[in-house]
Amino acid sequence: MYIKELTETDEEKRERSVEDNVDDGDKAVLVSRGNVIVLTTKRALVGVGARALFYPTLVYNVVRNKLESEFRWWDRVAEFILLGAVPFPSDVPQLKELGVCGVITLNEPYETLVPSSLYKSYCIDHLVIATRDYCFAPSMEAICQAVEFIHRNASLGKTTYVHCKAGRGRSTTIVICYLVQHKNMTPEAAYSYVRSIRPRVLLAAAQWKAVVEYYHVKVLNTQSCLTDATSALIPRNVKQVCSGNVVVFDDGSMVVVTHSDLEGYNDDDSRSRRSVKVNGNELWAAAADLSMVYRVKVVGQAAMARISCLWLGLREDQKLSGKNLSMGGISVDISVY
């Protein structure tokens, strides 16, 4: 009799992990070739509804486009950006005439009416970002990819056509994100600007949330990094010298003793040789003339201040500790002849 311990396979572990994270009745789990896809009930229901309503709403938009002059299929919202509804194969030549060299499709496969091969035959680059209709927004990664696609074409003078089914929500999300990053607009200003050109645009809550998140992550964070980089260019010692116990040195306080200042003094060797000693911050002058002592003391203080500033400059990466700066004794002999 052999007893064999049963262990879970990797697939069983994966399924059990998914089951632990899925609430009963709230999510549907699809397992295909080892890939586990978790769908919320809301997403599944919206997907079914979107499929059922695609062609009826498409016909509705076509009829309004034919009857109402203000209900345009696409609008030029920027010099190199067209925002509009899903194009038909017959629209591709006209888009090419308008200078379109790139198309961003935010439709799911069942909503796409023009294959990539047709765009390619007209030398039009095609970027597909499949996004569910109505209540959903593209991911942050997809938005960044689309914005870069538009910016790259615009820098080359090429126009990009951004579309979803009706040109209202998903495609508008991409266009607004481009405007806030490359046209220096706030989300509110960009939204109002696009609506002034294409009045029927309308963002769902998730789409507006994606715009605001993109603005904070890609725009405000970039500006913050630029501010930090600018502040980093300011040497630390500039802030340090202006604070603490450091005295700013004034070149005007320096007094230079020249030979003419010494004229008239006794040439006797016993009185002409004066010894000056500087120890720390104290300067002693062995001179009978009080004015001579004052002049030499000012020069000594000026020299001490300049040496202190030079020493602090070498320690720009260290924070001032507030300790007194100590220097060795300096002996200065001034001989008057």
From Swiss-Prot:
GO terms, biological process: phosphatidylglycerol biosynthetic process; root development
Where can the motif Glucan phosphatase signature motif CXAGXGR be found?
A: 164-170
What the record says about disrupting the gene is: No visible phenotype in the double mutant ptpmt1-1 ptpmt2-1. But plants lacking PTPMT1, PTPMT2 and PGPP1 have strongly shorter roots associated with a defective order of columella cells in the root apices, with stronger effect than in the single mutant pgpp1-1.
Which residues does the annotation say bind substrate? Answer: Y55, D133, K165, A166, G167, R168, G169, R170
Cystine pairs annotated here are: none
User: What is catalyzed by this enzyme?
Assistant: O-phospho-L-seryl-[protein] + H2O = L-seryl-[protein] + phosphate; O-phospho-L-threonyl-[protein] + H2O = L-threonyl-[protein] + phosphate; O-phospho-L-tyrosyl-[protein] + H2O = L-tyrosyl-[protein] + phosphate; a 1,2-diacyl-sn-glycero-3-phospho-(1'-sn-glycero-3'-phosphate) + H2O = a 1,2-diacyl-sn-glycero-3-phospho-(1'-sn-glycerol) + phosphate
**Boundaries of every Tyrosine-protein phosphatase domain copy:** 73-220
- Which pathway does this polypeptide act in? Phospholipid metabolism; phosphatidylglycerol biosynthesis; phosphatidylglycerol from CDP-diacylglycerol: step 2/2
Molecular function (GO) terms listed?
A: phosphatidylglycerophosphatase activity; protein serine/threonine phosphatase activity; protein tyrosine phosphatase activity
Question: What tissue specificity does the UniProt entry give?
Answer: Expressed in stems, roots, flowers, mature seeds and leaves.
Asked if Lipid metabolism is a keyword of the record, the answer is yes
Outline the segment boundaries, as ranges, of region: Disordered.
Answer: 1-20
What keywords is this UniProt entry annotated with? Hydrolase, Lipid biosynthesis, Lipid metabolism, Phospholipid biosynthesis, Phospholipid metabolism, Protein phosphatase
Q: Would the keyword Hydrolase be found if you checked this record's keyword annotation?
A: yes
Q: Which Gene3D superfamilies match?
A: Protein tyrosine phosphatase superfamily
Enzyme Commission number(s) of this protein: 3.1.3.27, 3.1.3.16, 3.1.3.48
Enzyme's top EC category: hydrolase
Top-rank lineage group of the source organism: Eukaryota
Active site residues per record: C164 (phosphocysteine intermediate)
Q: What does the similarity note say?
A: Belongs to the protein-tyrosine phosphatase family. Non-receptor class dual specificity subfamily.
The record ties this protein, via PANTHER family, to: PHOSPHATIDYLGLYCEROPHOSPHATE PHOSPHATASE PTPMT1, PHOSPHATIDYLINOSITOL PHOSPHATASE
Role: Exhibits phosphatidylglycerophosphate phosphatase activity. Involved in root growth and columella cells organization. May possess protein phosphatase activity.
Q: What is this protein called?
A: Phosphatidylglycerophosphate phosphatase PTPMT1
Q: Which source organism does the UniProt entry give?
A: Arabidopsis thaliana (Mouse-ear cress)
